[in-house]
Amino acid sequence: MSGTSRKAAGLLAVAVAAAMALTACGGSSGSSSSGSGSVKVGLITKTETNPFFVKMKDGAQKEADTEGVQLLTAAGKFDGDNASQVTAIENMVAAGVKGILITPSDTKAIVPTIQKARAKGVLVIALDTPTDPQDATDALFATDNLKAGTLIGQYAKALFAGKPAKIATLDLAPGITVGTLRHDGFLQGFGIKHGDPSIVCSQDTQGNQARAQTAMENCLQRTPDINVVYTINEPAAAGAYQALKAAGKEKGVLIVSVDGGCAGVKNVKAGIIAATSQQYPLKMASLGVEAGVEYARTGRKAAGYIDTGVTLITDKPQSGVDSKDTSFGINACWGAK
């Protein structure tokens, strides 16, 4: 989700490695080809290690097998690896795919390559993360990330019931659409605006647990009595909790998050996270493959935005905020159960 710039030499090395891996249909970048159908659809994720993208790949493969088509896959070596995604698109177009599904790492930098693919007649659908501008792809299949943030903001506000809040926001990175939408949604749900004095600390984490732990430690040094922590995702929530626990403050702080992975839902059940907004990567991918196959067979293109749903998961429901319990969350979660 990060658009962090890299040194030119590093980018070149990553791009060359990704090209070799895709050509070989295997290797450390996660590139592969599966299935024997004449129709080819590509899936390019941000990484191959995050359980969210593992579940997305599983959903795409299941749908490809059902449809009898060939699925080509590739992934960046790290979150923010635009060079590998550029190379993957170019190689998939050369391989004759009819559709490409992509979770863009750099929502702006990837656009020229997407435009070239579309100009050659390839359907391109963004999954999870919209490009900037959003209409750079034919369609977007994703969580309503503003709603995901709003739900946890409403939940936190209801739980606090007017008590003074001192809020830390552990965000993604500047300029990344998903992070901005979730952050803004949380503020809207809590009923505050940017710059509100109740926001006592904001730190970027890249959605990484270790960075989030460091960020939370920094926030606690600045404001020891923080009592609400918004986190961009569940790894960031886990990092925040570790920092709070080390400081002996884990009992008095409300942590809310977004993702709905199995590890995160288990943390809700354990009381580490109070509530999380669950999203559905398998659905994004399966609908994406279905749309790619439809285009290949009929010429009909998916267009616009398809909301793949979001559900607030908590075992401490609050009046006026729709939610489901962790039993529901575990049944619908992604990652190791």
Tell where the protein language model's regions lie, with residue ranges.
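A residue-level marker of the well-folded mature domains of exported/periplasmic proteins
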Residues: 2-11, 18, 25-337
